[in-house]
Amino acid sequence: MIVRNYTNTLLELRTCEARYKLLQERREVYYVKYLGVRSPNIEKIGSGKNWSIDGMSVFLDLVGRVNEQTGMSLDDELELLAHQIAELNTVLKRIRAALRKMEGLEFQLYVAIVIDGKTVTEAVQEIAEKNYISEQAVWRYHLPKIREELEAIRRKK
């Protein structure tokens, strides 16, 4: 169960980070477009007359405008995502600490492969040496027990 929670939390973190990056880029595009060197005042038509608005007010309007899909402005959503990313990182640290304390070859294999980033072969060799068993036994009896979890992680990456 803890392995599945780790995987799901890690994927949720990656999703939040991707969304945060996307929104940061959108905010940057608005900034360059309306406050950049090449963007002086913008002409806007209002009440049948042409009148200009400075770029700062347009930029602030765009980042402060509430998105109908999310119900938040761009700045509010960025702030919320930053908070969620920090929270998920804290949760992942706790899960990693708990996984490292667990006994059992399957958990040791999982930690070596997923958290430490070792290849399956390196992890099997390390676990076999640490626990004084043959590599063949690890390949045959212990690795198949976590293979499904490892495949799920590879598919979701």
Where are these regions (language model features)?
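Preference for long, well-ordered alpha-helical segments
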Residues: 108, 125-126, 140, 144
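The DNA-recognition helices of helix-turn-helix-type DNA-binding domains
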Residues: 116-117, 130-131, 145-146, 153
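Short amphipathic alpha helix immediately N-terminal
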Residues: 101-119
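Helix-turn-helix DNA-binding module
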Residues: 117-136
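Major-groove recognition helix of helix-turn-helix-like DNA-binding domains
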Residues: 134-148
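N-terminal interaction/assembly modules
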Residues: 1-98, 152-157
